[in-house]
Amino acid sequence: MSDAPDPSSAANTMWGGRFAAGPDAIMQAINASIGFDKRLYAQDIRGSRAHAAMLAAQGILTSRDAEAIGEGLLTVLSEIEAGGFPFRVELEDIHMNVEARLKELIGEPAGRLHTARSRNDQVAVDFRLWVRDQCDAAISGIEALMRAFLAQAEAGADWVMPGFTHLQTAQPVTWGHHMLAYVEMLARDRSRFVDARARMNECPLGAAALAGTGFPIDRHMTAAALGFDRPTANSLDSVSDRDFALEFLSASAICALHLSRFAEELVIWSSAQFRFVRLSDRWTTGSSIMPQKKNPDAAELLRAKMGRVLGAAVALFTVMKGLPLTYSKDMQEDKEQVFDAADTLMLGLAAMTGMVGDMQANRESLAAAAASGFSTATDLADWLVRELNLPFRDAHHVTGTLVARAEARGCDLPDLSLAEMQEVHPGIREDVFAVLGVENSVRSRTSYGGTAPDNVRAQAARWKELLGDAA
């Protein structure tokens, strides 16, 4: 026996009045969204209760009907949250499933709930409420990760490590400075979600199908009841707008990119070739054949999963790019992308917060790597400019020549003798060696935003104050 719903049943009594026959079973499968939009149940019920209260306040519903609707919707909410609600695919979506159950519970008044409302504005408000909640969750998750990076920055404000360009040693920096770079990225991520939330905080409920309604509704009342700043100002835009979802996905994609970048660094840094960090057993796995292995699987999986967030953004941009005003059924494809991106991002933020909180920096390996690869060559060039008044380009050439000599000898710059240096430029003095140490190098980078330990401590204190964590 087929599990497909019977097209001749009363499955589509919500809209089937002008149809002589029900939809094909395959059409029902294509059309149904209850498999994923049931996640909107709380927002749908919240919106419906606000709508019913407004209708009663405006004299469109009796207070008795509005009370029955409100209590019935709370019963539906309890049933769904208890896990026993019978979602029915033939009812297509969360809106019809809730309304059908409400009718079973309270009878005729349930049919009055949809007065002055369409599924077009209903889903628009449900989805906005859900995405708004996810913005709040993302902001909270980002702040937790910022605090984890700040703790690492404070602990390692003066731990020297190599800074890289092209994944090659460039100049010495501090561990704390590197950690604060991610705090800056995450702060921008946070601000993007804050901005997106502010822009989406307008209520589309009451726009109806696309043209508004002739009923004397109070859209400001429903907007206030649902925590929106104001109602949307154009009914056509209200039901066709998915900018709020696109902005959420855009902010999520950029944040995911930042998580992926640090995940990549963790994979590299935890390798035997680098040994910069030790990852906790909680975030690593072993090998089924190689007993010695400790694989950074959490970082690798996070690096891969973050690509799904970018993919979700591209997918929804692609759905929306060719749609005329106002609503098209294409827009039903908006939710799965947003749901998956939100789930993936929140998982990534939680995992990264745990990894950053648990990771242990190997100070010896960091310092040894910082001192290799001619990392203080720029300090030497700066000394030549500052002490010998050489033009920087000349100083750059002199330093490059000295690097080549050291490389030929198989040593680093501090291992060259003063006499060898003076063969390249006779003005070089003994005090040049003071600038060739990595500790002196990082201490000298005192320009605003530089890597000097005092700068790192000041920036960490600033961020703690901004996050409300200052002592």
Curated annotation (Swiss-Prot):
Is the keyword Secreted assigned to this protein? no
Give the GO biological process terms: arginine biosynthetic process via ornithine; L-arginine biosynthetic process
Task: List the record's Gene Ontology CC terms alphabetically.
Answer: cytosol
Domain of life here?
Answer: Bacteria
Spell out the InterPro entries in the cross-references: Arg_succ_lyase_C, Argininosuccinate_lyase, Fumarase/histidase_N, Fumarate_lyase_CS, Fumarate_lyase_fam, Fumarate_lyase_N, L-Aspartase-like
Looking up Gene3D superfamilies in the UniProt record yields: Fumarase/aspartase (C-terminal domain) (1.10.40.30), Fumarase/aspartase (Central domain) (1.20.200.10), Fumarase/aspartase (N-terminal domain) (1.10.275.10)
Molecular function GO terms recorded: argininosuccinate lyase activity
As for family, the record states: Belongs to the lyase 1 family. Argininosuccinate lyase subfamily.
- Recorded protein name is Argininosuccinate lyase
Q: Which organism is it from?
A: Cereibacter sphaeroides (strain ATCC 17023 / DSM 158 / JCM 6121 / CCUG 31486 / LMG 2827 / NBRC 12203 / NCIMB 8253 / ATH 2.4.1.) (Rhodobacter sphaeroides)
